[in-house]
């Protein structure tokens, strides 16, 4: 079993890396896949209202042999539930579906700027934290100006910003802002959706050098950037492969070379324009 380390967020709460992305893990098979991941050492399970599998995540937590206090369950508020009161109601709904007393990390899924209620939603999440419904609060797909607004208007800095991040889109400027403000970067689609990324010659060569797979090279790159990747997989062998990235270290030049593969987003997911309700 890989030894998956924990870190501390800016609110002092523990956080684990890597996490398990649970998108499309549904039904009994989804629950079994999540339990297998927990048994393999994963401690962070990432879900969302829009994934329509919060109940399965809760079932997996209860079915696992790991104490609830050792697990970190994260969920996300969808655009259709933005607003201060609406955010609290959304979180209560997630808790009901999860069958849990508290959510460890609550995120805003997308800012949905045309709706213009992400700041009020953030205030609602602060309310939920003060009410003991959630432990840590953060955001997903927020830009630097949006983060500045949250901090300036409320005095509360997000613990996490989960964003698209992979060697084709390393987000150096945003990561630097995160580091400056103590915001943990979390990477969705960390393997670029297993596009041609894993066939890149550089990654193939580094895999040979370290006796690992190209997937492990990429996930190790995330770790050394200071970002928590959340790859998704229902296959227990692949889950173990994805978690087993702490037995080697890339050089600084190798990290920079991987970042040099940059080409842009996988799709038109610009937070300034993208809407997801």
From Swiss-Prot:
Residue sites binding NADP(+) per the record: 189-242
GO molecular function, one term: 2,5-didehydrogluconate reductase activity
InterPro entries: AKR, Aldo/ket_reductase_CS, NADP_OxRdtase_dom, NADP_OxRdtase_dom_sf
Top class in the EC scheme: oxidoreductase
Entry's Gene Ontology cellular component terms: cytoplasm
Subcellular location, record wording: Cytoplasm
Binding site for substrate: 109
Reactions catalysed according to its record: 2-dehydro-D-gluconate + NADP(+) = 2,5-didehydro-D-gluconate + NADPH + H(+)
Keywords, in A-Z order: Ascorbate biosynthesis, Cytoplasm, NADP, Oxidoreductase
Protein's GO biological process: L-ascorbic acid biosynthetic process
Keyword Zinc-finger tagged: no
Active-site feature positions: 51
Annotated EC: 1.1.1.274
Protein role: Catalyzes the reduction of 2,5-diketo-D-gluconic acid (25DKG) to 2-keto-L-gulonic acid (2KLG). 25DKGR-B has higher catalytic efficiency than 25DKGR-A.
Note: 2-keto-L-gulonic acid is a key intermediate in the production of L-ascorbic acid (vitamin C).
Family named by the database record: Belongs to the aldo/keto reductase family.
Name of the molecule in the record: 2,5-diketo-D-gluconic acid reductase B
Record gene name: dkgB
